[in-house]
Amino acid sequence: MAQWNQLQQLDTRYLEQLHQLYSDSFPMELRQFLAPWIESQDWAYAASKESHATLVFHNLLGEIDQQYSRFLQESNVLYQHNLRRIKQFLQSRYLEKPMEIARIVARCLWEESRLLQTAATAAQQGGQANHPTAAVVTEKQQMLEQHLQDVRKRVQDLEQKMKVVENLQDDFDFNYKTLKSQGDMQDLNGNNQSVTRQKMQQLEQMLTALDQMRRSIVSELAGLLSAMEYVQKTLTDEELADWKRRQQIACIGGPPNICLDRLENWITSLAESQLQTRQQIKKLEELQQKVSYKGDPIVQHRPMLEERIVDLFRNLMKSAFVVERQPCMPMHPDRPLVIKTGVQFTTKVRLLVKFPELNYQLKIKVCIDKDSGDVAALRGSRKFNILGTNTKVMNMEESNNGSLSAEFKHLTLREQRCGNGGRANCDASLIVTEELHLITFETEVYHQGLKIDLETHSLPVVVISNICQMPNAWASILWYNMLTNNPKNVNFFTKPPIGTWDQVAEVLSWQFSSTTKRGLSIEQLTTLAEKLLGPGVNYSGCQITWAKFCKENMAGKGFSFWVWLDNIIDLVKKYILALWNEGYIMGFISKERERAILSTKPPGTFLLRFSESSKEGGVTFTWVEKDISGKTQIQSVEPYTKQQLNNMSFAEIIMGYKIMDATNILVSPLVYLYPDIPKEEAFGKYCRPESQEHPEADPGSAAPYLKTKFICVTPTTCSNTIDLPMSPRTLDSLMQFGNNGEGAEPSAGGQFESLTFDMDLTSECATSPM
């Protein structure tokens, strides 16, 4: 079954997560219209190779045209309009950068796959997530639902008792007024009053019973409000707080957060019970106005009960107003909470009290740094204005599940310029990527005679003015959400807390697993720990400061740990994603470990790792060979950077890599990917067939051009090569190489520079693939 069809069959909570994957950058309508074709394309490869991305993008436009023709035949005007609008948008945004749309689609398909896996795992385990505390959480939720059922039952029981009290009071009131009128007549007639005294005793008994019933109801109401307080505290201080913490974790690459539907059902149920209870308390006031007496419990306790239920409902409504989707720029979906001035960002708020009567009644207003103006001025922080559509009415139509929400899709920030054209205080202690700002959402609720001011805010955001600030800004978001669940601490970086390696390691692994199919292994994390903390045996519990993580240069390097790692993450996502997902890239490995595992392998065995010295991110391969004396040698080629990988895929570099000896014979030193995977098996599928690169020439045309093929070649030194039986198939013939073919000394660490050659084929080969 197609992936899109499988997704349509998921539960509502998963469908809501699916809805959050899509935005204007890649509309869900397009995913729906072209589902089979979209799933048949290799978007990951397109995301790493511009020529293929261009081809796929133009094919996408062609598929849109075909689908438009179908809608035209069906006279489906609405779909025609939507599809035309989508095509115009895609052309305007991605025509010059097709790799961008390829990356977006590849990520969406990957997230869809993860969603299906999560749902399948939950189904196999009876609905429990694959987490050690899943059973405990489920038990807590079951207890919470039982408490909610108990509250609802007690409310209904009170409803019945209120009717009994009302009937009893009506009887008392009728008898009292009847007796009073009869008593007046008897006084006029001078009749015997013995009957009157007997009826008075009956009225006193009725009043006693009425008083007992009233006291019972008042007592039960007090107990019910206490039960509501307990349930509400569990909902807001535990369940909702847990959801908000999981949202923080999801924002920095952790496991996807569960949707809010179940929590919304619980909160709505409690709110309905509270409103019904408030009506019951109002009913007590009506009963009191009809019949009251000395020591009346309603007179004594009703005002307090009214105050308690109103406070409960107000607080519940305020807690139920949440930011469902944190601010995020659509072009950077994997890095929320970082906003660039002048660039649109989106966000979504939701009220977890699903009352139909509130549909289209709540107008949301957005502002930034509402309560921190004085603090911002004191710290010298920048100030911003929110532009775009900064007000919106909440409704139930925009969400798939009918939740009461408002999604802001067209917001931008503009900095308020000071008189000196810069920051308010040039002596500010924080750099701009450490400034934290809050986006606030406000509205007013008028419901059943109550006016409630609602306010919620985003997690702290970092505002940048240049995309080159993104790495440090994202580091700030990681550090903040890793170490605190305080949602409003905008002064966090005036004295940033210290993290432990265990915390940092988990977050670093998330940076890979959230955007690829593979996180970091223990061995890879250990290598990173060495980079941060130096050699050690056990890094668990070791402390890492904010400065060491992001601001201080690594030992012997001119850049920080985070700048180096972030560029590697970018390299993986844009250029070697497919190879990383396959597990072919060992990536982070110390040179000592590299030598240890390769030295026992046969010549031609190689591994792929990231450069430790390239600030911009580089990837290289290291192989084992034997020199003329039979001694094992470990060699590394000079790392390939993004600029080089933009011209040729890493898989094609590996498949075509050669060394050139002094006699100009080309030999491939790469045979087996560690531990023993044949090179062709691992990388062949990621290289485009040469028949596609060079379409056959027209037999009737003029003499065909010679085909060419780009390969990377490392020249070797010429010393001692005469004694070698130079054969491309004999790896034992490989010798110690240098940086050039003029007898230069080998480079330090055995690194080779590679040259890219454009090899002309003979005319005999011109019409046949190599």
Swiss-Prot record:
The modification Phosphoserine is found at residue 727. The modification Allysine is found at residues 601, 615, 631, 685. SMART domains: STAT_int (SM00964). It is found in: Cytoplasm; Nucleus. Coiled coil: none annotated. Belongs to the transcription factor STAT family. This is Signal transducer and activator of transcription 3. It comes from Rattus norvegicus (Rat).
